[in-house]
Amino acid sequence: MLTVLYLPIARKTFNTDVADTLRQETEELLQETVELISPMELMTSPDDLDAFLQDVSSPPDAIVYQSLTFADGEFIQAAVDRYSIPVIVWSVREPEVGGRLQLNSLTGGNSTSHVLRSNSHPYSFLFGNPDEAAVQERLGSLFRVMDTVKQVKSLNIGVIGEHPPGFYFSGTDTGELHDVFGAKVTTVDLYDAFARAKDVPEERWLPEVETAEKQVLTLNRDDATVQRFAQFTSAMREYIAEENLSALAIRCWPDFFNELGAAACSTLSHLTEESMVSACESDIHGALSMFILNRLSAGRAPYLGDMVHVNEENNALVFWHCGAGAYSLAREATGAQPGVHPNRKLGFTMEFGLKAGEVTLFRVGHTPEGYRLLVFKGEALDVPQRFNGTTVEIGLKQPVHSVMQELMEEGFEPHYALVHADVTKEIREIGRLFNLPVVEIEA
């Protein structure tokens, strides 16, 4: 759970009775959703605030700085001098219009935002009273974002084998990745993983088959590639536990087919279904993109695919991959079906079209200028799979050729992550908190 430091700020020259009522309502709201650190009273001077902060023993993950009345920049400066964590600046409404300005909270929030911007300190802004549904919804959204940021900063991505030759977009500068996101990479030799997988005994790999059988229709447990899938998945679980991994980027071809005699797609699908997001072709930023979508959507399974086809009739883009896709992403009409790799003819892979619904497409991208984020929305259409493997056809509101052209001119990497949820607002906040540009395509 997110640990939040609540700072209710007010000056005694304003209406502190109204301010304190709003403070109490806010505390009740926050206690329902986060682990709260609160002074339980208004902070009306920098000395009060400093004394309280000195007594805070547990490290918070975020600050809710509520400008209950106007207050100068000393208050927030004292907080950011002590903490580098994200801040939610919260201004409340005036209790009534006419006569004396009782709170001047909005100016307080404006002043606070200026101080934070001048300090290059990550923050978001919230306006309204704690009893408003829209405020509660946005606050919950911001907490999801900040919890995701917290998890990204401690993320350890397991990279199992180097990316294929020429797949430059799959790699990363590990130092820059850590400097920007806090995430780190742990490398595992793919052939060591193969050797470990082959030694996994049946009593350890059989439960993986039993789990897959519940979600993959007509899966043949006697197929040798099903056993190979289960053995490699079991080996991955060992590495995940040993190295404390939270995401995977796995080199799949040609090594899996040549050395293991099976496709990697099923392991990627199986683990992603369990929120251990796994990207093929050792795409490190693809794994990071999937991880962020999974956390922002409260654990929904993300997908990673290439943009491969334009369907003008449906004004849609088709995304595809060889055979990876979490089981729960399959259309209800077909369910998740086992198959063989379309090029190598080895199993087992996933064969299905993705289910319908609103989706957010997202990518953590990189250029010579540094990191950037891509986001746009679409509608996954209820259509059969378009090619062997897994596919999703994304209907757009804007002309499909215009969207495709813009994506090409922006030059984003050819792996796009998506999730069945609208998290575009959250992606914008992710960009703000990591101080990254967000390229939002009007699609």
Curated annotation (Swiss-Prot):
GO BP, sorted A to Z: fucose metabolic process
Keyword annotations from UniProtKB, A to Z: Carbohydrate metabolism, Isomerase
Class in the EC hierarchy, top level: isomerase
Cystine connections: none
Annotated signal sequence range: none
GO cellular component terms given for this protein: cytoplasm
Amino-acid biosynthesis recorded as keyword: no
GO molecular function: L-fucose isomerase activity
The family this protein is said to belong to: Belongs to the SqvD family.
Protein known as: Sulfoquinovose isomerase
Naturally occurring in which organism (per UniProt): Alkalicoccus urumqiensis
